[in-house]
A protein has these predicted regions:
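Conserved acidic catalytic loop of the alpha/beta-hydrolase fold
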Residues: 327-345
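Short alpha-helix in the alpha/beta-hydrolase fold that links the catalytic acid
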Residues: 292, 453-463, 487
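Catalytic histidine-centered segment of alpha/beta-hydrolase-like enzymes
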Residues: 312-318, 380, 451, 471-473, ...
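Extended, polar/charged low-complexity intrinsically disordered and coiled-coil segments in eukaryotic
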Residues: 2-264, 448, 474-478, 485-497
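Short beta-strand/loop motif that positions the catalytic acidic residue
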Residues: 437, 442-445, 449
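Active-site nucleophile loop of the alpha/beta-hydrolase fold
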Residues: 308, 372-382
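Conserved alpha/beta-hydrolase
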Residues: 289, 297-317, 472
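Gly/Ala-rich beta-loop-alpha elbow adjacent to hydrolase catalytic centers
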Residues: 347-358
Length: 497
């Protein structure tokens, strides 16, 4: 589903006002309640009020929330600092950018069902793009600018500002004239004009702002200590439940896992006996996957669950604002496989986990024997749907409000997206997949996904030679449902294992 600027629905308004506003209001209430209780109420009034359990609960919460809010304010300021990231070099970035621009360029002559070799192009001309392909790209390109302005309002300097970030993670004014980055940026603006069949108006439109995740402010919304207590309690209880069901906690390098050995099952006679690595998505942690985990534990294969504190509200964990890097994830995955004697695995990833999945496919492809991607957000990242919808699209429906406030604006998640996001590194291309037969690859998408343009992803997969036997688009489903709700999506995932 493409991003929409439709007004907030009635259900969305109710969700925004009731749970969201109430959670937000707890901290201001705490700052009022503590001085009110100690400075305004008399001794007899304090005794009377504290006899009420609800008041006592709010008071104790306020005692915790006041100092915690100061800590969270400091942590949020700290999260705004720029972070040094390792980006692909100019030659690699040139190839990636051209490869992305090449996708969908010839819609009238699109070849479906043929796997494409790695691009060897060093440029892109206007003649290589038909008008249908240019029209689609004109719509997508606007999503890299706040409010999705008409293309006519995006001037050349605005476009250069975004391209400088996209290909060099730099501001145009900081790029040295004649440097490799400067050459690539100038090439990029010309290629983009060819791809769009559009020449940008000279100058800069001050009303237009580009979206540059690693440079823009971290968009985090405050939440009370009670929110983190509840979320972390759910996570700890989920860990405890897993450990009492035969699992272990193990650490390899900078990454930790919940693991369990094989459970022999005479019905398992195929390659489905491969160990399974589960890489979860954004949210409150493993607790949100409880329905899926109950069924996941019933699998006879060895299982591994990657722990990701930075996207699981674990605010006091050392990785909350300092998650392991791509190379550390790959090294840890190789280490756990070597320690356990695994020569190949099934990788199951969900939502944001599909970006980590992309790292593993490029860094340890030999170990990724079978790949299952649910609610995949790592395809077609250059089109801007995911970034715009997750961070900048006005909320419309109940699920968008819940995801927008309770997930996207949570500090750890916001910092991960805004300070650790290298789009070209988290991008998953068809060529990264070792095999594309149905036994080795399954991609599960949601028809009404408000983060991902499922139709565009399916079109890309078809254009790249991936057959319908490898793709499931769950009718009527919304983002996240594939592993949260036991319906068609989850059933397909479990069958794929």
């Amino acid at each position: 589903m493409a991003p929409s600027d439709a007004p907030l629905s009635f259900g969305g308004r109710v969700t925004l006002i009731v749970p969201t506003a109430l959670v937000w209001a707890l901290t201001p209430l705490s700052w009022v309640l503590v001085p009110y209780h100690h400075l305004v109420l008399s001794d007899s009034q304090r005794v009377a009020w504290t006899s009420r359990y609800w008041y006592l609960f709010l008071l104790y919460h306020a005692y915790l929330d006041v100092p915690f809010s100061v800590f969270l304010f400091w942590l949020t300021k700290k999260a705004q600092r720029p972070k040094e990231l390792v980006h692909p070099g100019p030659d690699e970035m040139r190839r990636i950018f051209l490869e992305c621009l090449e996708v969908g360029a010839k819609l009238k002559e699109r070849q479906v069902g043929i796997r494409k070799p790695r691009t060897t192009k060093t440029s892109l001309t206007k003649e290589e793009v038909d008008e249908m392909g240019a029209e689609v790209m004109r719509l997508k390109f606007r999503q890299w600018f706040r409010g999705r302005p008409p293309l006519s309002e995006i001037y050349r300097a605005n476009a250069i500002e975004w391209i400088a970030w996209a290909v060099a993670d730099a501001r145009p004014e900081d790029v040295v004239s004649g440097s490799e980055a400067d050459i690539l940026i100038n090439e990029g603006i010309e290629w983009m004009q060819h791809r769009l069949h559009h020449d940008f108006t000279p100058g800069r439109n001050p009303k237009v702002e580009s979206i540059r995740l690693t440079m823009d402010p971290v968009r985090a919304a405050h939440r009370p200590v009670g929110y983190y207590i509840v979320c972390n309690s759910v996570t700890l209880l989920t860990y405890a439940w897993l450990l009492t069901n035969g699992c272990r906690y193990e650490r390899y390098g900078e990454c930790a896992y919940i693991t369990r050995g094989a459970r022999p099952d005479k019905r398992s006679k195929t390659s489905a006996g491969l160990p399974i690595l589960f890489v979860h998505g954004l949210g409150i942690g493993l607790g949100q996957y409880l329905d899926f985990l109950r069924r996941f534990l019933a699998q006879p294969q060895p299982i591994m669950i990657l722990i990701q504190p930075n996207i699981s509200t674990q605010i006091f964990h050392r990785h909350f604002l300092h998650p392991p890097s791509k190379d550390e994830h790959v090294a840890s995955f190789k280490a756990i496989c070597a320690a356990k004697g695994y020569t190949g695995c099934t990788i199951l990833s969900h939502s944001n986990g599909t970006m980590v999945h992309a790292w593993l496919l490029r860094g340890a492809k030999e170990l990724c024997r079978r790949n299952v991607l649910a609610d995949a957000v790592s395809f077609c990242l250059w089109q801007g749907d995911v970034c715009y919808s997750f961070l900048h699209q006005p909320w419309r429906e109940t699920m968008e409000v819940l995801l927008g406030y309770f997930v996207a604006r949570e500090l750890g998640t916001a910092h991960t997206i805004c300070r650790n996001f290298i789009w070209s590194d988290m991008l998953l291309m068809e060529r990264d997949l070792p095999r594309t037969d149905p036994a080795s690859l399954q991609i599960i998408l949601a028809e009404h996904d408000f983060l991902v343009d499922a139709d565009a992803v399916v079109a890309y997969l078809h254009e790249s030679g991936i057959s319908d036997d490898c793709i499931t688009c769950v009718k009527g489903a919304q983002h996240g449902a594939a592993l949260i709700v036991h319906e068609e999506g989850m059933k397909k995932v479990l069958a794929s294992l």
